Each structure stands twice: as structure tokens, then as C-alpha cells.
């Protein structure tokens, strides 16, 4: 590599909405440049997890080095950074984009620009990227390349006259994409003689190598045997092995400025290698950290409990292993009277939550119950203390609380205008505040501020069903705002059930409580005594349903005879039921929990 100059390197990422053919295009580029022999090719080369392939999404950032001989006769090294497309992983996307100078914007020629395309393009523009638009799926009968070009110019403001029309599936025009990368994207800048400065793009745990760190070198050279320092985590390590991905790992001697590769060292914990950190040489340190490094904050919390209590230790081990690979996932132990021992886990968003739960169930064979997802509330106490509340069951006495603040998000929704009315109504029902409404061709772009609390429950599913699956949705957490929030407890037979308590807005508490009670009434089996199911705010009951008792016909053996004989038997039964109600325990089956937590509005 030392023979080639920095001018012959191109670092680029592919920006696209889910399902617009990003991973397929990556496959074609790998194939076209002969990086992988044809017999070793598989679909979605860069999506290494099964779950990534099945859901057709990219979760972890990946990278591959392509070597390409261009029409001008020169050899180029192209580093493709494959980024996650989903909003939960926006920070990973921003770090991957910071490691590149340019992006390919892939837009499906039949679908047009979607909400996440927008979010990711704006991130790429923030990173000062040169952007080459690519129209994918032009071989489909429904493709309308000219309309989509207009859309790109209108919505994003990019000149789409030179957009490259391709079909990643059939391999049409892939050569033109490679030429566009070489000609239209800028080479990296960097000083070989300066002290080492590198951006930590991603890291993961490998059973044999320990922690593998993916880096983009900005200045200086990374060599074997060097001692490096992570500036954000303030830890030093020796470098054992350096290499690049041709998707498989291949060792090389050193990485120079502008290059992307990996190194391994004596690193034990992925938590020490934080995405976005700056890496420098321990002896000759760089003075300035790279900008944009931040700690990843969990946004959504929920409890995960094993269905079988004997699995608790296995669950603890499984979480430790996942945490090795995904430092943005956090957990701590908690106990629940209803569900036993488990963990309170923090996630970047709902998709992240689903994926972690699915990976735990699939990779470690665990059966799990998850409690209702909740967000982090800030409580301003009367004594001036600021508390963070992760679990609604831990809410302190309301008399001690001055104000409750909840996180709000700025959501961008793109929808065909036929469904606009339904989408606006949904946002209004969820306490949304409309910020903006624009038309782009036949589609409306709506911007709303919404409380995250209203979105975590089932907002996405409702949005999809209202718009027949056509609306796309993207959000980022904007700020905390004061809200009139109250803790709603569910009481079964006058006993509070901790797993079902939740924080709700006062205006929606009654409807939420009534729905919950009705649902539980159908789910809890009848007992020999009457069971009240109540929703309460503090000491005030706001909704109640009663599960009727099963009763035995105690008078069946009396034929005729005196009425007082029957009355005696009935009174005796009544006494027994009363005593039973006082001391009886209500068994709430696990299915009832799972169904109650999946409650639709």
C-alpha cells in the first residue's frame, strides 16, 4: 500500500432508506472489483448476523476494502463503510460518516425519497460529504427515474442530473458507480509525518482475538507493536495485529493516513473502546481530540425476566456476552414481586430493544418476558435534587416531587397525501405539536414534536396500519419538557402489581386505566371468590372491573324442606368466600402479563 499515494484512496459510505437496496449494491461492488471470488459470494456479504439478514437490516457498521483499476489506468483503493440505516443507530451512522469523505445516496426508483433517506442525507451533509445520487431498481416496471430525480432535487436540494441509474440486483451499470466514486468523490487529507490520530469507528468482541477495533487513520501511521492510547477512555494498549477487511480479515504491516482497517491488542472490554473516540500513540500524542465524540445515552428502558426462574444465571451470562459486542446496551438487576428476578435494560430505541431481545432468545435459547417499555423521566424534587426515573414502579411519593419532565422527540413523517388526515389525527391523539407541513409531489412531509412516552408504545405500528404501510417515520430526541404525568398503579384484589404500573399523562390516565382493567378482566381466570381489578392514581381509584366468583351450588342436596336450612348453607358459603377473599391469593398467569403489556389503545 505504501507505493500508492493518498490521492488514490476513496472512503465512502452508502446512505439509503431500509429496503432500497444498499446491501445488495455493496455486494455488487465487491463482486465487480473481484474482491471476493465468485464461488464465495453470498447475499448481503456485509450483514454478518443472521438477524441482520432475516430482517434485511444492517445493525453494526461494517467495512470492506475494494481494489479497483479505473479507466484512467490507475489503481485505486476504495473503502466502503456499510452503515446501519435505522434511526436507533444514528450515532453509529454519524461516526461511520465522519470516517468518509463522500457518500452514495441510493434511492429506490419506484419508491422515491423516504424519511430515513432524509435523516441520513442531512447527517452526510453535516459531515461535509460530496454526495453522488444513485437510482436503484430502474429495471422494475414501476420505476419512475425522472420523477424520483425531481424529488431528490426538490426535497434534498441535490443536483440529480448526473444521478447514476442502476439495478443492483441484475448488476446493471455497476461499473459506472465505481467510476463515479473515483471521479466525483474527493480523496482524504492527512499528514504522514504528524503524530498518530485515528477515529474509532466501531468495535466488537471476537472469541479468539479479543476486542477488534475498526479505525480510520486521520494523521500519522499505525504500526504493529506500537503502544496506543484511547483519549476519551484514557487507557493504553499494545497493538498485536493490523489488517483490513476484504470482507474476510487480511493482515497488513501498517495503516497510513486516509486508510481504514482494524487492529487487535490486549483489550478485554468492548466498553473501553467507545465509538467516536480518538486513538493516538502513547509516546507521541496528538494535542487535539477529533470532534463529535459523545457518550451514547439509553433512551428506552424495559425489564427483561426469564419465563423459567432457573434460567436467571444463563440470562446474566448472555447479557454479559451481548454487552461485550454492543456497548450501547446497559443493564442492572431488578426484582419484581410478579415476575421474580430479572434485569432492567436500557436501549437506544425500540428496534434496538427488539433486536437485543431476539438475539437473547435466539443465540442463547432463552424464553423472556419483557415489561412495558418506558422512557427516562427527570424528577425535580422539592428539596432541589434532580433524579432520573427509569422504572415507573420506583416513583417516589408525589408530595415530594416539584415537577416531572419527560423526553420529547422531533419526528419527520413522509406519507402519501391520501392518508394525511389519519396521520395528523394519530399525532394529535398522542399529544403532538405540529411544527411543519410540506408537500413534495404527491407526498406530504409532516414534522411533529411528540412525547417519547407516547411513541414507545405502539406508535409505529399504528402509523403503518393507518397509511397501509406507505408512511415512513424518523425521529431524534430533542429535549425534556415539563408534563402533567402521574403514576398509574394496577391493583388486583387490592394488591398492587408492580410490573404493570406506568407513568401516564393525566388527561389519558382514565382511558388507559379502563382499557387495562377490561383487558385483565378477560385474562385472569375466575377464582372461588370475587376479584376486583382496579386502576389507581395515588389513593384515587379511576377504573374498576370485577371478576365474578365461581360458585358451588351448596343447596343442591336440600329437597324441599325449610327455607332456613338453605339460608344457613348459603350464609356459611358467604362467610367462607369472605374469608377466602381476605386471605386468598390471585394467580395471574404469565400470558396475562404478556397480553396486557401488548395492549393496543
From Swiss-Prot:
The keyword Zinc does not apply. Its EC number is 3.6.5.n1. SMART domains: EFG_C (SM00838). InterPro entries: EF-4, EFG_III/V, EFG_V-like, EFTu-like_2, G_TR_CS, LepA_C_sf, LepA_CTD, LepA_IV. GO terms for biological process: positive regulation of translation. It is a peripheral membrane protein. One of its GO terms (molecular function) is GTP binding. This is Elongation factor 4. It comes from Methylorubrum populi (strain ATCC BAA-705 / NCIMB 13946 / BJ001) (Methylobacterium populi). The gene is lepA.
Amino acid at each position: 500500500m505504501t507505493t500508492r499515494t493518498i490521492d488514490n484512496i476513496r472512503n465512502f459510505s452508502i446512505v439509503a432508506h431500509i429496503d432500497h437496496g444498499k446491501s445488495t449494491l455493496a455486494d455488487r461492488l465487491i463482486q465487480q472489483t473481484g474482491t471476493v471470488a465468485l464461488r464465495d459470494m453470498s447475499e448481503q456479504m456485509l450483514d454478518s448476523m443472521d438477524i441482520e439478514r432475516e430482517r434485511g437490516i444492517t445493525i453494526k457498521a461494517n467495512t470492506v476494502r475494494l481494489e479497483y483499476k479505473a479507466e484512467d489506468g490507475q489503481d485505486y483503493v476504495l473503502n466502503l463503510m456499510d452503515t446501519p440505516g435505522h434511526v436507533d443507530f444514528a450515532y453509529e451512522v454519524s461516526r461511520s460518516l465522519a470516517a468518509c469523505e463522500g457518500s452514495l445516496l441510493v434511492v429506490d426508483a419506484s419508491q422515491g425519497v423516504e424519511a430515513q433517506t432524509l435523516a441520513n442525507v442531512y447527517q452526510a451533509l453535516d459531515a461535509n460529504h460530496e454526495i453522488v445520487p444513485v437510482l436503484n431498481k430502474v429495471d422494475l416496471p414501476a420505476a419512475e427515474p425522472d420523477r424520483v430525480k425531481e424529488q431528490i432535487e426538490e426535497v434534498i436540494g441535490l443536483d440529480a442530473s448526473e444521478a447514476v441509474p442502476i439495478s443492483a440486483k441484475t448488476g446493471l451499470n455497476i461499473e459506472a458507480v465505481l467510476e463515479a466514486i473515483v471521479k466525483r468523490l474527493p480523496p482524504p487529507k492527512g499528514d504522514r509525518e504528524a503524530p498518530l490520530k485515528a477515529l474509532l469507528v466501531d468495535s466488537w468482541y471476537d472469541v479468539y482475538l479479543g476486542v477488534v477495533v475498526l479505525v480510520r487513520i486521520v494523521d500519522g501511521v499505525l504500526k504493529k507493536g506500537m503502544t496506543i492510547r484511547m483519549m476519551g477512555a484514557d487507557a493504553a494498549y499494545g497493538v498485536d495485529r493490523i489488517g483490513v477487511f476484504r470482507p474476510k480479515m487480511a493482515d497488513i504491516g501498517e495503516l497510513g493516513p486516509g486508510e481504514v482497517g482494524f487492529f487487535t491488542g490486549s483489550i478485554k472490554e468492548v466498553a473501553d473502546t467507545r465509538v467516536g473516540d480518538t486513538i493516538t500513540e502513547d509516546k507521541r500524542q496528538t494535542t487535539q481530540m477529533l470532534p463529535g465524540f459523545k457518550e451514547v445515552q439509553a433512551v428506552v428502558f424495559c425489564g427483561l425476566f426469564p419465563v423459567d426462574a432457573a434460567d436467571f444465571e444463563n440470562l446474566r451470562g448472555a447479557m454479559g456476552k451481548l454487552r461485550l459486542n454492543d456497548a450501547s446496551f446497559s443493564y442492572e438487576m431488578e426484582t419484581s414481586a410478579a415476575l421474580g428476578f430479572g434485569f432492567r435494560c436500557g436501549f437506544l430505541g425500540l428496534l434496538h430493544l427488539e433486536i437485543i431481545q431476539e438475539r437473547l432468545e435466539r443465540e442463547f435459547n432463552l424464553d423472556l418476558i419483557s415489561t412495558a417499555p418506558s422512557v427516562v423521566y427527570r424528577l425535580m424534587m422539592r428539596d432541589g435534587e434532580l433524579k432520573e426515573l427509569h422504572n415507573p414502579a420506583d416513583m417516589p411519593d408525589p408530595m415530594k416531587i416539584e415537577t416531572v419532565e419527560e423526553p420529547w422527540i422531533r419526528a419527520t413523517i413522509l406519507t402519501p397525501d391520501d392518508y394525511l388526515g389519519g396521520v395528523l389525527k394519530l399525532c394529535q391523539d398522542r399529544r403532538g405539536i405540529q411544527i411543519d407541513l410540506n408537500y413534495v409531489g404527491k407526498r406530504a412531509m409532516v414534522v411533529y414534536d411528540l412525547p417519547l412516552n407516547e411513541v414507545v408504545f405502539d406508535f409505529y405500528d399504528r402509523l403503518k396500519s393507518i397509511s397501509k404501510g406507505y408512511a415512513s417515520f424518523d425521529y431524534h430526541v430533542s429535549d425534556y419538557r415539563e408534563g402533567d404525568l402521574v403514576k398509574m398503579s394496577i391493583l388486583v384484589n387490592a394488591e398492587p402489581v408492580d410490573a404493570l404500573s406506568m407513568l401516564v399523562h393525566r388527561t389519558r390516565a382514565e382511558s388507559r386505566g379502563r382499557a387495562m382493567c377490561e383487558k385483565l378482566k378477560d385474562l385472569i381466570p375466575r377464582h372461588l371468590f370475587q376479584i376486583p381489578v382496579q386502576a389507581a392514581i395515588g389513593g384515587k381509584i379511576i377504573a374498576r372491573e370485577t371478576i365474578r366468583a365461581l360458585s358451588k351450588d351448596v343447596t343442591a342436596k336440600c329437597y324441599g324442606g325449610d327455607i332456613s336450612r338453605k339460608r344457613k348453607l348459603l350464609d356459611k358459603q358467604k362467610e367462607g368466600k369472605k374469608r377466602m377473599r381476605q386471605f386468598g391469593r390471585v394467580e395471574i398467569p404469565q400470558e396475562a402479563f404478556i397480553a396486557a403489556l401488548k395492549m393496543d389503545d
